[in-house]
């Protein structure tokens, strides 16, 4: 049986206010997702000081020659405290995907098939790309909100789905126009939801988090 849906915090805000809120939000979640924006603003040491001993999800969407990807992952494992997850492009070559899966790290690799902000994608083509990754051994995916139902129907509980762009009804106004609500995400079998701006914008972060818990 699948465990209850969990929340990951996407921490890419870099203003003074955003960084202060990032430190606060991090106290109440298990995992913090960081990307190019935050990592080009702060050092890994500064990020660790900001979020504490939380699991780190490195969202760099790696896509390069196999050895470069493998070496980068292994080096990040040494450089980032509590390195737990990383993303790579699921549309890359078989060899690169295998390199991401076999890198010497305890971090969990997540394949990205389609960006959550992309409204123009071919569903059948996307599902075929999921199948190819599954055949190569991928078990964890960043999943477009509008693909969750189809992916669950096709693969059942064989894979875990991490879904960005999850919004409350009151927040469905920014560039994640393809968003799911937390309730719908849970109904569709999402394992992890990734939430950023709604938490950074919240006046009461603890209360806002409760609205996302299902």
Give short role names for the model-derived ranges:
Residues 2, 22-28, 41-53, 75-80, ...:
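Acidic (Asp/Glu)-rich catalytic clusters
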Residues 6-15:
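N-terminal basic/disordered segments at the start of proteins
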Residues 33-34, 53-65:
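Active-site cofactor/substrate anionic-group-binding motifs, chiefly glycine-
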Residues 34, 38, 44, 144-194:
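A C-terminal functional module that forms or caps the active site or interfaces directly
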């Amino acid at each position: 049986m699948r465990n209850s849906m969990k929340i990951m915090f996407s921490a890419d805000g870099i203003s003074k206010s955003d960084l202060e809120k990032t430190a606060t939000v991090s106290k109440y979640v298990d995992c913090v997702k960081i990307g190019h924006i935050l990592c080009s603003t702060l050092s890994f040491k500064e990020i660790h000081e900001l979020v504490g001993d939380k699991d780190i999800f490195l969202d760099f969407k790696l896509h390069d020659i196999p050895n470069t990807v493998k070496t980068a992952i292994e080096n990040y494992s040494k450089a980032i405290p509590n390195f737990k997850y990383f993303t790579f492009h699921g549309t890359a070559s078989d060899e690169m995907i295998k390199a991401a899966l076999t890198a010497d790290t305890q971090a969990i690799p997540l394949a990205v098939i389609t960006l959550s902000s992309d409204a123009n994608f071919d569903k059948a083509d996307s599902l075929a790309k999921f199948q190819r990754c599954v055949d190569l051994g991928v078990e964890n995916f960043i999943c477009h909100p509008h693909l969750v139902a189809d992916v669950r129907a096709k693969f059942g509980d064989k894979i875990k789905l991490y879904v960005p762009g999850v919004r409350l009804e009151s927040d469905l106004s920014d560039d994640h126009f393809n968003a799911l609500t937390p309730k719908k995400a849970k109904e569709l079998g999402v394992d992890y939801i990734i939430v950023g701006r709604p938490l950074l914008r919240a006046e009461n972060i603890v209360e806002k988090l409760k609205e996302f818990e299902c």
